[in-house]
Amino acid sequence: MATIAAAAFEALMDGVTCWDVPRGPIPSELLLIGEAAFPVMVNDKGQVLIAASSYGRGRLVVVSHEGYLSHTGLAPFLLNAVSWLCPCPGAPVGVHPSLAPLVNILQDAGLEAQVKPEPGEPLGVYCINAYNDTLTATLIQFVKHGGGLLIGGQAWYWASQHGPDKVLSRFPGNKVTSVAGVYFTDTYGDRDRFKVSKKVPKIPLHVRYGEDVRQDQQQLLEGISELDIRTGGVPSQLLVHGALAFPLGLDASLNCFLAAAHYGRGRVVLAAHECLLCAPKMGPFLLNAVRWLARGQTGKVGVNTNLKDLCPLLSEHGLQCSLEPHLNSDLCVYCCKAYSDKEAKQLQEFVAEGGGLLIGGQAWWWASQNPGHCPLAGFPGNIILNCFGLSILPQTLKAGCFPVPTPEMRSYHFRKALSQFQAILNHENGNLEKSCLAKLRVDGAAFLQIPAEGVPAYISLHRLLRKMLRGSGLPAVSRENPVASDSYEAAVLSLATGLAHSGTDCSQLAQGLGTWTCSSSLYPSKHPITVEINGINPGNNDCWVSTGLYLLEGQNAEVSLSEAAASAGLRVQIGCHTDDLTKARKLSRAPVVTHQCWMDRTERSVSCLWGGLLYVIVPKGSQLGPVPVTIRGAVPAPYYKLGKTSLEEWKRQMQENLAPWGELATDNIILTVPTTNLQALKDPEPVLRLWDEMMQAVARLAAEPFPFRRPERIVADVQISAGWMHSGYPIMCHLESVKEIINEMDMRSRGVWGPIHELGHNQQRHGWEFPPHTTEATCNLWSVYVHETVLGIPRAQAHEALSPPERERRIKAHLGKGAPLCDWNVWTALETYLQLQEAFGWEPFTQLFAEYQTLSHLPKDNTGRMNLWVKKFSEKVKKNLVPFFEAWGWPIQKEVADSLASLPEWQENPMQVYLRARK
């Protein structure tokens, strides 16, 4: 696919050394949309005046004035065009009577061309001007079935007679060429200078045309003052990126949840969740949408059977509506969900030829189920929608009731904003409000995830961005020099990262990179380095396997492995600082600084603009065994593995391995910290042995196997996405916490509450968790357990919140308020568990955590799960704990209380003393 447009351009321009354009005719600028159209002739103002495209099995060449088709000076190009359009050698060439002089040009070159009133069989090439209104359907089907169409005309005069607001939809030529993504506009084309391009010219970011989408927005939102999208589903955000696409519903941050587009002769309306297409409260909008999609026609509205609740909404307002298992040709409008791409091609042709498509869906669930896969490329809805200039993002949007966007809000458009941004970077008259700048940053990063290979419109925008960013350079951003998230610098950071991830050579973007963290004496190894990684992953989650290598900023590494490994679902990851800082107000680094690549071939070049440690990601359940991986272009990083790395080897690494980040590893935990911190660590063995002791305790309490199926990870970063630390894989912490996790003496004397708290989060399980009450409570059981059983630090000393006076104060305060469940959280909630532990020990917890791993069909609500815990714990300790939990305000169900009534009363219930005191 990558060479289709390039090869076509080469064929069209073969032997063309100049554009000998007649001076008299005034051309119209052409507007290109979709994924097939590309420019052929562009003037020095960047206006497209000749374009080519394809539709179905056929091809089109569109010329911006019919006079060009009769000009002998353009004969070399016209002959190339006819040759490229010809479906097979010797196919007939027909010329409409309106272009009779073209026959002579073609015949003089030895081509058999004849004047014909319309194209016929067998399929060949047909040449016509853009003013014929009687052959529209014939010409579309001619191209769709494999014919080649050469068409020329200008629309500015037609616009002067019929109005500029009708050009795109009603100008005769556009009724044909628009199916292939090419439109004649009412804008004059400049005739001063034309350059013969050596490669496919760039498509303009923003083209002026008379038709105003504000009229469409007004029609779609008529009679509506607010859009209440609280329909039970969590919507995705939408990306509006096509020249003829526009937003309809926006939240205060310009995040889009309803959008629409013109495409070809048809129209599309997109909702960010399918629930929006069935909710009665959305009825007025849905009626407007279907009527707008129908374009005044009275045809049938088809509703896919998966969206059957929409039918009554439409039928009760007099719309002819039927349930349909599939799209069929006799429909005027079709309504469906965005979760299957089986009919993608048919839907795209349906819209292109005049149909209306109402479609809805979210992409966040697909993204969660397909880690490592890009929703912009692989989500079925986007396979349908991308060509329309609309996409569904994996990012969610908080449902609410939003006022209809103001005209100013509705005027935001990714392409227009990018055009303004370009002007600003070029020190021209550009202006973007901060809200638009912040939105551009997010939209740009998302747009760059759409696969550009073989799509001229996307390739063109990538080229434009490369030029913009090379000209502006990358800003120096650091903790000492942060940038605001709504600044031009932040937008540059996000766009550069997205561009690099899309395949752009990082070295082009990284020149003069202001965030170099490496020693200037570091250079990639000229010799390949082979490391053996463990390809066995018995766990339920993907596992990062360290290579001990680092890729420098802006560099490429060549990774090679065996054919067996290339078919095993492995990925290469550059960088471990996986927190996405897109929502942060200030940035001390780029928002995204890691990148993953599938190793689905034996050799692959990988890169990341910001550099990073290299990992191989082994998918869950992998039984691959030892895998040799050869990497060229990386540098060794400090890496110490407990039980494998000798002290001498570590000392040598500290002298020779100068990469900015290194790792300390056991089979159960891996710590990623700056090399500067590691240089002070004379011998990593004692601290790692302590970590392994603590990890064994973590596993013991959780009733999980030890060694861990997948080592936990703690990664330090200059900035993280939430809190002082946060859980996950990896656990993230600030640089200030590094000393806390690698200094054995401090850990033994002062404790290490925060990291164990986060490890506790990673052990929490849905069955015995009651969010939001216990989210920040039960994780602390691990902190208490590790401090007491491994570090020998009593709970009262391990954290100030667990001193006896503090604990007593909290209990009294909670009971004094009537023990409201809404206040039972964090330390108050932990107290409940500590009282149980102090009475019955740790064993019931360990036993229950093990038992819960075997349970299925657990209650889905908090009340059900809390009652199950009461029942299970009571049975485990053979005491009726109902009064104890009731004292804490738990919602005990009668059947649970009755089932435990035969158990002995818990005489030592620690809550009794407080309850008696209150009486």
From Swiss-Prot:
PROSITE patterns: PEPTIDASE_M60 (PS51723). Gene3D superfamilies: Peptidase M60, enhancin-like domain 2, Peptidase M60, enhancin-like domain 3. One of its GO terms (biological process) is positive regulation of protein targeting to membrane. The keyword Transport applies. Coiled coil: none annotated. Keywords: Cell membrane, Membrane, Transport. InterPro entries: Class_I_gatase-like, M60-like_N, Pep_M60_3, Peptidase_M60_dom, TCAF. GO terms for cellular component: cell junction; plasma membrane. Residues 542-841 form the Peptidase M60 domain. SUPFAM superfamilies: Class I glutamine amidotransferase-like. One of its GO terms (molecular function) is transmembrane transporter binding. Isoform 2 is expressed in the prostate and in cancerous prostate samples. Isoform 2 interacts with TRPM8 (via N-terminus and C-terminus domains); the interaction inhibits TRPM8 channel activity. Interacts with TRPV6. Belongs to the TCAF family. This is TRPM8 channel-associated factor 2. It comes from Homo sapiens (Human). The gene is TCAF2.
